[in-house]
From Swiss-Prot:
Descriptive protein name: NAD(P)H-quinone oxidoreductase chain 4, chloroplastic
Main subcellular location: plastid
Compartments, record wording: Plastid, Chloroplast thylakoid membrane
Membrane topology field: Multi-pass membrane protein
GO cellular component: chloroplast thylakoid membrane
Organism the protein comes from: Lemna minor (Common duckweed)
Domain of life: Eukaryota
Transmembrane parts of this sequence: 4-24, 35-55, 87-107, 113-130, 134-154, 167-187, 208-228, 242-262, 274-294, 305-325, 330-350, 386-406, 416-436, 463-483
One MF term in the entry's GO annotations: ubiquinone binding
Family label: Belongs to the complex I subunit 4 family.
EC code: 7.1.1.-
InterPro entries in alphabetical order: NADH_Q_OxRdtase_chain4, NADH_Q_OxRdtase_chainM/4, NADH_UbQ_OxRdtase, ND/Mrp_TM
Disulfide cross-links: none
Gene that specifies this protein: ndhD
Length: 500
C-alpha cells in the first residue's frame, strides 16, 4: 500500500501556495486577503482530517513518518513525523494563524508581501513542530526569523526598526548556540555523523559534553521562550508589531522555545536535564514574580500584556523542571492555553488601541460605555489569563503546582518555598490585569475629548474572539481533550529519568 506524504503536504503547502500571491493584482487587496484566508482554511481542514483519521492517540511512538533523502553528501534527510508532544502545537499553529489572517484584514499597504510572510511563517512553524532531523529542525527555526523581522520593520509602530533590530540580534545570537549544539550532537557518534532524532535519542554522551550541549540548546530556547534575563526583546517587539503579528508571536513563536526545551533538552539530554532542572525551577519561580511586578509598572498596554506572557511562561519552565507526569503535562497544557489567551489579549488590545488612537493606559479611561462588546471580551480573556476556574489557565497552573509538590526530585522545604513564591505570583497576576481593565474601561477620561465617538467591535472582531474563547472554555471544563494527546509521550520521556 503506497503511503501518501501528508506531513510534507501540510508543511510545504502554505509557502508554496503563498508564492502565487505575487501573481495577483497589485491593487487587489480584497483578492489577496480572500486568497490567503482560503489557503489557511484549506490547510487547517487538511490538518484536521489527517490527524482525525491517521493519528492514533494510544501510540507514544512517531507516527505518519515522511523520510526522503535530500542531500547525499551530508546524508541529510527530509524527515518529518508527529507524536503526542507535537500534535497540540501543530493544531494550535493552524488555528491561530487562520485567525491572525482574519485579524490582518485592515492591512492594505503591500498586502501581497504581508500575507506571503504570514504564510512563510506558517510553514516554518509547522515544519519545526513536525521535524525529525536536527538540521531540518535548525532550518525551520531559522525560517521564522526573516518573516518576523520584515513584518516588524515594515508594518510596526514608530520604533519598529529599533525593535526589529533588537529581535533579530537576540534570536540570531540564540541561533548560533542552536547551530553549535546541532552540529555537536550530530557529529558525535561511533558510527559517523547522524542527524536523525531516533538515533540521537539513543546516543549516550560523556557528562561534560552533555552539559555543554544542554547549555547551548538552553540559551537558544531561552531567547525564544523567553527566560529572564534574555526576555528584553519581547516587550519592545510586542509594543511595536501589528496586532496580527503579535498574535503569531505570543500564540506560536514563544511556544517554539518551550517545545525545543522538551523535545531536545529533556528527551535527548536526560542526565544534564536532571542536573539543570532545579535551576530551571528557581528561574521559573523568579520569572513569575519579576515579570508580574514589571508588568504592573508598564504604561504601554501592549507591553503590559507582553510582560504577562513572560510571567505565564514561568509556569512552563517550572513544569519542565519538575520531572513529574503531572508537572510536564501541566506545562504542555499551559503552552497551548497561553497560545489561545495571549493571542486573544493582543488582538483585543490592538483593536482597542486602533479605535481610540492611544497606547498608554494612563491616557485611557471610560471605554466600557461606548465599546461594551470589546469590554466584555477583554474582561473574559483577562479572567482566563488570571486562571479563573472553568478556564484553561486554571487547570494548567494547578497541574504545575501539583507537579512540583509531588516531585521526588526536591526536598520538602524546597517545595514549600517554591510553592509559596509561585502563590505570590498568582496573587500578583489579578493585580496587574484588573488594574489594566480599570485604567482602560472605567472612569470618564475619554469623554472629555472633543471627538469622543468610538466604534464598538464589528462582526470580524467578535468572530475571532469567540473562536478563541471556545477552546479556552472547552479545555477548562474538559482538560482531557488536550492531556490525552500527550500523556503517553510524557510517560515515555520521563521513563529515562532517575533522581539524584
Amino acid at each position: 500500500m503506497s503511503y501518501f506524504p501528508w506531513l510534507t503536504l501540510i508543511v510545504v503547502f502554505p509557502i508554496f501556495a503563498g508564492c502565487f500571491i505575487f501573481f495577483l493584482p497589485h491593487k487587489g487587496n480584497k483578492v489577496v486577503r480572500w486568497y490567503t484566508m482560503g489557503i489557511c482554511l484549506l490547510e487547517l481542514l487538511i490538518m484536521t482530517y489527517v490527524f482525525c483519521y491517521h493519528f492514533k492517540l494510544d501510540d507514544p511512538l512517531i507516527q505518519m513518518e515522511d523520510d526522503f533523502q535530500w542531500i547525499n553528501v551530508f546524508d541529510f534527510h527530509w524527515r518529518l513525523g508527529i507524536d503526542g508532544l507535537s500534535i497540540g502545537p501543530i493544531l494550535l499553529t493552524g488555528f491561530i494563524t487562520t485567525l491572525a489572517t482574519l485579524a490582518a484584514w485592515p492591512v492594505t499597504r503591500d498586502s501581497r508581501l504581508f500575507h506571503f510572510l504570514m504564510l512563510a511563517m506558517y510553514s516554518g512553524q509547522i515544519g519545526l513542530f513536525s521535524s525529525r532531523d536536527l538540521l531540518l529542525f535548525f532550518m525551520m527555526w531559522e525560517l521564522e526569523l526573516i518573516p518576523v523581522y520584515l513584518l516588524l520593520s515594515m508594518w510596526g509602530g514608530k520604533k519598529r526598526l529599533y525593535s526589529a533590530t533588537k529581535f533579530i540580534l537576540y534570536t540570531a545570537g540564540g541561533s548560533i548556540f542552536l547551530l553549535i549544539g546541532v552540529l555537536g550532537m550530530g557529529l558525535y557518534g561511533s558510527n559517523g555523523p547522524t542527524l536523525n532524532f531516533e538515533t540521537v535519542a539513543n546516543q549516550s554522551y560523556p557528562l561534560g559534553l552533555e552539559i555543554l550541549l544542554y547549555f547551548g540548546f538552553l540559551i537558544a530556547f531561552a531567547v525564544k521562550l523567553p527566560i529572564i534575563p534574555l526576555h528584553t526583546w519581547l516587550p519592545d517587539t510586542h509594543g511595536e508589531a501589528h496586532y496580527s503579528t503579535c498574535m503569531l508571536l505570543a500564540g506560536i513563536l514563544l511556544k517554539m522555545g518551550a517545545y525545543g526545551l522538551i523535545r531536545i533538552n529533556m528527551e535527548f539530554l536526560s542526565h544534564a536535564h536532571s542536573i539543570f532542572s532545579p535551576w530551571l525551577v528557581i528561574v521559573g519561580t523568579i520569572q513569575i514574580i519579576y515579570a508580574a511586578l514589571t508588568s504592573l509598572g508598564q504604561r504601554n498596554l501592549k507591553k503590559r500584556i507582553a510582560y504577562s506572557s513572560v510571567s505565564h511562561m514561568g509556569f512552563i519552565i517550572i513544569g519542565i523542571g519538575s520531572l513529574t507526569n503531572t508537572g510536564l503535562n501541566g506545562a504542555i497544557l499551559q503552552l497551548l492555553s497561553h497560545g489561545f489567551i495571549g493571542a486573544a489579549l493582543f488582538f483585543l488590545g490592538g483593536t482597542s488601541c486602533d479605535r481610540i488612537r492611544l497606547v498608554y493606559l494612563d491616557e485611557m479611561g471610560g471605554i466600557s460605555i461606548p465599546m461594551p462588546k470589546i469590554f466584555t471580551m477583554f474582561s473574559s480573556f483577562s479572567m482566563a489569563s488570571l486562571a479563573l476556574p472553568g478556564m484553561s489557565g486554571f487547570v494548567a497552573e494547578l497541574m504545575v503546582f501539583l507537579g512540583i509538590i509531588t516531585s521526588q526530585k526536591y526536598l520538602l522545604m524546597t517545595k514549600i518555598i517554591i510553592t509559596l513564591v509561585m502563590a505570590i505570583g498568582i496573587i500578583l497576576t489579578p493585580i496587574y490585569l484588573l488594574s489594566m481593565l480599570r485604567q482602560m474601561f472605567y472612569g470618564y477620561k475619554l469623554f472629555n475629548l472633543s471627538n469622543s465617538f468610538f466604534v464598538d467591535s464589528g462582526p470580524r472582531e467578535l468572530f475571532v474572539s469567540i473562536c478563541i474563547f471556545l477552546p479556552v472554555i472547552a479545555i477548562g471544563i474538559y482538560p482531557d481533550l488536550v492531556i490525552s494527546l500527550s500523556v503517553d509521550k510524557v510517560q515515555q520521556i520521563l521513563s529515562n529519568y532517575y533522581y539524584r
